């Protein structure tokens, strides 16, 4: 039986959560923080316990960024650096898998680059089977191709797996007109269209990912995951973060929300 969230019933039944590599470390640091990983796992496990089918795309920038590695050096080729960055996402994925399963949340780690000893290969039908069995699916190695960001991988997997929303977890509580950590006068947007994001070059996701979400009509919610319970709040329809989509943000108790929550994902 599904657990009842203190924030109310979920609006969405299948969600793609995008976690950057910096989610796995303390602010301003690199590597792995057990405390940060545990905090992510607690929130994700509570969401899964409410009956939400959850796929998580993980980044690897806390360990290595391929694009950064190639600056000012010619020893490591750019494509190689990107592959190195992909392997970093597997480290994060393994850590998150263990943290989730330690909380009793059945989890599967899938990769687009085969690593049979430690993860399952990404096969769409297999991923869907896991989701339908209420297992959390952790997706590592991005798309498996260099020069493609994990944001784009998240947009691709969100569409491929029939997710209703792509939730991008960040350190700030939405999308701003400027960097709020540098500009105290920056204004937070509550709702945006894809066209506004592209026209104004707002820092939501890379342009390829935004274009993919536009083409597939996959809404994006950018929110601050550092605040405990925010993942549950977002899924329950509380007005947090910034909503990017063709239609207005669904809200708890609205007709659109009721229809979304009652529909079973395929």
Residue ranges of predicted features:
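C-terminal catalytic "cap/lid" subdomain
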Residues: 1-266
């Amino acid at each position: 039986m599904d657990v009842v969230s203190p924030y109310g019933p979920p609006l969405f039944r299948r969600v793609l959560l995008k976690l950057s590599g910096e989610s796995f470390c303390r602010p301003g640091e690199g590597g792995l923080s057990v405390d940060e990983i545990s905090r992510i796992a607690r929130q994700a496990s509570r969401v899964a316990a409410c009956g939400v089918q959850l796929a998580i795309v993980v980044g690897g920038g806390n360990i290595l960024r391929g694009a950064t590695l190639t600056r000012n050096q010619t020893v490591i080729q750019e494509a190689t650096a990107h592959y190195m960055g992909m392997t970093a996402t597997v480290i994060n994925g393994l850590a998150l898998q263990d943290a989730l399963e330690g909380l009793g949340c059945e989890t599967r780690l899938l990769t687009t680059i085969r690593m049979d000893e430690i993860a399952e290969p990404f096969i769409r039908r297999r991923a869907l089977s896991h989701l339908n069995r209420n297992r959390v699916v952790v997706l590592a190695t991005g798309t498996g191709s260099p020069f493609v960001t994990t944001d784009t991988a998240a947009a691709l997997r969100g569409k491929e797996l029939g997710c209703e929303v792509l939730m991008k977890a960040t350190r700030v509580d939405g999308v701003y007109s400027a960097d709020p950590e540098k500009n105290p006068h920056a204004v937070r947007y509550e709702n945006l269209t894809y066209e506004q994001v592209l026209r104004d070059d707002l820092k939501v996701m890379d342009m390829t990912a935004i274009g993919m979400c536009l083409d597939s009509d996959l809404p994006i919610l950018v929110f601050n995951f550092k605040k405990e319970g925010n993942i549950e709040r977002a899924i329950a329809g509380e007005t947090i973060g910034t909503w990017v989509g063709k239609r207005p943000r669904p809200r708890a108790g609205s007709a659109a929300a009721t229809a979304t929550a009652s529909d079973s994902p395929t």
